[in-house]
Amino acid sequence: MVRKILSTGFVLASIGLYSQTVITGEVHDTSGNAIPNVKVSFEGSATETVTDGNGKFIINIPSQKGTLTFSAENFHPFRRSVGANTPVVYVVMKEGSKEIPEVVISTQKKLEVNKLNIKNLDAPMTVNVLNRAVLQKWDINNIEDASKMVAGVNPVKQFAGFQFFNIRGFDNFVVLYDGIRDERHTITQSAPVASFANVERVEFLKGPSGDMFGHSALGGIINIIRKKPTYTTQGEAKFTIGSYNTYNVEMGVGGPISNKLRYRVDAGLMNTDGFKGIKEKNFNSSLMLQYTPDHQNTLEFFAQYNNDYYGADAGVPATNDGKPYDWINPMINLSDKRDYLKNEKKEFYLKYKHRFDFGGTFDYKLSYFDDTLDYLMDEVLFTDKTTKTLSRKNGPYHFKHVTRPLMNQLDFSFGFDTWSLKHKMIVGNTFSYLDRKTWNGDVTEGTSGQNIPIVDPVLGMGERRVDITKVKSTEEIVTGFYFQDWIEFADRFKVLLGGRYDYFDGVYDDTRLITAQPNLKKETHHNFTYRAALSFQPIKNFMTIYASSSSFFKPTRPHDHRTGKVFKPEEGIQMEAGIKLEKKDRLNVTISGFYIEKKNLLVGHNVRSQVGKAYSRGFEVDADAEIFKGLYAKVGYAFTDAFIGKQEPEPGQVDISHNKTPWTPKHSFSAWANYEPRTFMKGFGVGLGVFYTDETYRTEKNDQTLPAYTLLNGAIYYQAKNNIRIGLNVENILNTTYYNNALSSNDLYSNDPADKPYQATFQINPGRNRNYKLTISYSF
């Protein structure tokens, strides 16, 4: 009898053991980022687990087959059939569409801009994110308007469509698209940025980031993330009409082609007569394919084409304190109607990602773009107060930049332990080849106007003909090797160490007649940049105190093409400390202080010089909060004291010691409040924002200034249950007259000394007056 009982027990135990099935897997979002703290449950039982920091899980299910459910905050629930024949599963969860506080305050989002896939709360650096919900609420579809929402970032737009950014007192920055560098800004500082028709979010990383992204990243990084394919069919369409006879159409759709292949297609078309008659036309289209043959491998292909036209705006002549001449209406566009900036860009990249069983990843990126900037403009205005006339005595300036960079990047990420220390590490290599040609032309037909009445100007008639006569070439090869190590000493105490070695090799041919022989010059640099940071969480998952130090390097190319002066590379360091607060996607606060030192500072534009050191110190506050249910607020403040160090001026030169750096407001402030009723009038929303920018100097001599200004903007919208949204946005509600951009004495000059008395030395651009945008959109 005992033997029978034992035998029966053994059989039952065997059956119980046999019925247990071990399932392992990973959970990622649609961008391939691991999702921690996902609840994994087996339906019909109490069996459950959660994913770890790498999105991995192991669960023993009490039967041969069944269904697992996956749930996480800010993601749609997901169900997956599993069994003995599927011991390993790879799950992709789609981000949920919730009310504004959950969407806007994305505290748990792991940021692409920090490379190590670290949560924002943990990252010992200042990062600001404008996600799709924010862009939609404020109807933002360009980088200039997006940058105004971030403390410490001052966007500057000159010569029609050339965009650059002053970040923490300096205009050295790097623009990334999906983590891939746009080298145009590092060569000539400014370049057009395409519309946001296919943009998912924008990440701003402030301060030097040479260890992660290579040369020229002193002020910071701007990473523009495009929309990705999804596992379910999703799409949206948006139509906007507005002031200045503006219309904008955007459409996008994505989803599965098969179980392993997904797509995303986006397109946008914008046309406007523009404020002051400054016309603009943008066309943007893109395709992304994502292929996942199994849970370990992902292949991504992306192609984009944009063709943009920007009308000219040379501004209006002004006094050095930023006031237009009292006999000129600042709202008149004095530029020749035939002047233009055209930008055509074709971009491609291929990405491959492999996930190893031990948790590491291998990433490969290959990218190429072909960009043409065609520019023609009478930049300098000559005016005669007696006759109230305008002339363009210099004639138009023309160039065509053709930029073709090829970039290759390899990253290997992995984790390991040394004694009690946990490491998350990345090592990588980048290689880039840049080919750039600049063609200059002479206008042989369609001369510039002279003695044009300013009251009722006729600003250009007929076509212009440009004959290419000169060329300048640039070829650069940059090879970089880098590492970062995220070390966890304890659950609340972590250290980030990073370093990068760059080898820079450039060959340059000065501007010459296209019939002349090249005169090549060579420049070679070796440089090491670093980052060291500490992160401590006194209150776990709520508060982080951090401190960091990082460095910067920028090749200045061999000389100034206008004067022939040879310049040294610019270098710099930053020290930063701050506090971050986050709570369940209801609160996201960063308070940071910084000190930056820059060596071999370059100043000027028309005539450039290298003057030694410059410094920037300040603090910033960025806060997002849901004050109560339905009321969301975003506040940003930046204090930036950036100045040039002690100088020994050359004979005849102005002493600029301790002068403020150009384009740097000492104080800037923005605040936006958005309210959505939760019961009565549910679906309606209203928002109000205020933006303040302090006065800014436009030259290193501090002799030309744009006054401070304050703007009030607003929005009202209705979100219907059928996914239709109608919104009205009003910019500059109080119809304030203000000036936000300018051409200074650094940019303006006279070809003939006899004309100098009539030449404008300061041409300012007024910002848009009160204007409206009405948008209707549909998503599915």
Question: What does each of the following model-derived ranges do?
Answer:
Residues H28, K39-E43, S71-F75, N85-V134:
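Short, acidic, small-residue-rich periplasmic hinge/interaction motif at the N-terminus
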Residues E183-R184, N198-E200, D211-S285, P293-N297, ...:
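Outer-membrane beta-barrel translocator/receptor signature
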Residues D294, T403, K422-K424, T430-L434, ...:
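Structural signature of Gram-negative outer-membrane beta-barrels, strongest in the C-terminal barrel
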Residues Y309-D321, D435-K437, D505, S535-E576, ...:
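Surface-exposed extracellular loop regions of Gram-negative outer-membrane beta-barrel proteins
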Residues K351-S367, D371-E379, T544-Y546, P569-E648:
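Membrane-embedded beta-barrel scaffold of Gram-negative outer-membrane proteins
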Residues D491, Y595, G612-E700:
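Gram-negative outer-membrane beta-barrel transporters
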